[in-house]
Structures are given as C-alpha cells and as structure tokens.
Amino acid sequence: MSWLQKLKQGLSKTSNKISESLVTVFVKKKLDQETLDELEELLISSDLGVHTSHHIITKLAKHKFNQEVTIDEIKSDLAQILIEILQPANKPINITTKPHVILVCGVNGNGKTTTIGKLAAKFAKDGHRITMAACDTFRAAAIGQLKVWADRVKAEFISGPENSDPASIAFKAIDAAKENNSDIVLIDTAGRLHNKTNLMEELSKIVRIIKKQDQDAPHETILVIDATTGQNAISQLETFHKFINITGIIITKLDGTAKAGIVVSLVQKFKIPIYAIGVGEHLDDLNEFNPEDFSRGLLGL
C-alpha cells in the first residue's frame, strides 16, 4: 500500500464523518447563510476549532455565497482553503549541523519513543550515523524499547541507571556523538503531563545542559502530539512552548480518531512546522507532512 493510500485510510474516520455530515447539511443546493452556519458547526465538531472553522467559512462564503454548488465542489473548495492554511507547516527536518541534536518531548502515552525509533530508521536509511539517548530514566521499559530501536538501526545507544539524571545522559550522548562522528543525536525524554510544573522544569534543565555542549543545540525540539487528544493538543503545545522552544511537531495516531481536524487548528494558531504524521504502528506509517495530501485525505478526495 502506498503512503497516500495509508494516509487516506488513516484519515477515514474523520473524512467519513465529514462526508456523511455534508450529505445532511446540503439538503439544498444553494450555499445560503443557514447552510454556511451548519457547515461551520460540522467543521468545529471535527476539531478544527472555532476560530479556524470561522476563517474557512468566511473564505468559502466570499467566493460561493448564494451560489448553487455540489458536495464535490464544496469538498474541493474546502481542500484548497485547507492547503493554504497548512502551507506554513510544510517544512521537513533539515540536518544542517554535526552532530544535529534533536530533543523529543511530549505527554505520557503519545507514542513518543516509537516515533523516535521510526525517525532513527528514516535517518539511517538516508545514510546518517545516529546516537540515541535514553533520557526517560523513570521507566526501564522505555529504555529497553529505545535500545531495541538503536540496535535495529545500528545507532550508538547512551543510557544510565534507572532514575538517574536525564540531563547528564543528554550531555554524555552529545559527547559520544562527537567521538563517534555521529550526524544526529536523538534524545528521548520522559512523558510528562504539561500541567506538572516540576517535570516541565526538568525539561528546561535538559535544554540548559545541552547548551553547555553546543550553544545552538538542541537544533530541533519536537513535541509529539497524539491526535486523539483533539483540542487538548493546543494547551499542550502552549505549555511546552513556555518552558522550551518547540521548533516543530509530529502528530501520531491519526488513524485512531475522528478528530484529525486538530492538525489544521494547530497550524492556524501557531504557524508551526509539522515534521511528520503517523497513521499506524508500522515503520512506514510515519511520513513527512504534505499539506495537499493531508487536506484531500481529510475530505475524502
């Protein structure tokens, strides 16, 4: 199955919901105010958020108000508006320095460690030498999981005893990367609730210690977001960004939700790059974000 097919399949819960609702909304062919209001409610219920949904409807009304339209025409117009909104997110990770330090964070249970493993596999496939740092020292299972990925992609693996200081492991990993001539350092951190200040401050400490090795590092700080959390993802990103400079996001579990509209809401609000999206457990279920493919998939086109 191609990535495009996987993406459409992964977004089917959201696209089916939107398509079924559009049939209900468009009992009339004319795009009048009542129909626009119903369409706006539909977008909000798909987790595009109030502000984003209103923006989309305003643009749609500007071109098509009181005109006769088909459902397919509306889908096509909506897709074009979404593509425009999502363009700021269309930025891949560029490996510009050596070692290029990538810090990955997120709340508990969002698929963070698996995502790091998949990133490592993709970087290795591109010929990069990798060092992986297990800074989630609170869970032996997380260390073990990352070690499996490191072995699989033949990466240098740096860890410490359970409950050891995560910042010191990050520091050691960058040291090791310089010694073994790694191109990339991938740093896994413990999942943390964004409303726990002490854990968020620990993340700030990791960043401060990393900067002792390289003032410009981390070169990327990625927040992994579980799409099934819907609008809660906005408060996650806001809070993490207060403590550390989030440079981009990766959105996982899009296949498990009818809330994939949150992707649009996040980009509209933060204008932040989406480095990748995930639609399943397998290695090739994570891929670079493409605004056009995503927008068309979201609308079942």
Locate each region found by the language model.
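Conserved catalytic-core segment of NTP-binding enzymes
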Residues: 145, 165-180, 194-300
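Residue-level signature of catalytic and energy-coupling elements of molecular machines
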Residues: 11, 47-49, 107, 136, ...
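Short glycine-rich anion-binding loops that position phosphate/pyrophosphate groups of nucleotides
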Residues: 190-192
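N-terminal accessory targeting/assembly segments
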Residues: 1-19
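Primarily NTPase-proximal linker/entry elements flanking Walker-type ATP/GTP-binding cores
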Residues: 17-135, 142-163, 168-187
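Short hydrophobic/aromatic residue motifs in ordered secondary structure
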Residues: 50-52, 139, 255, 283
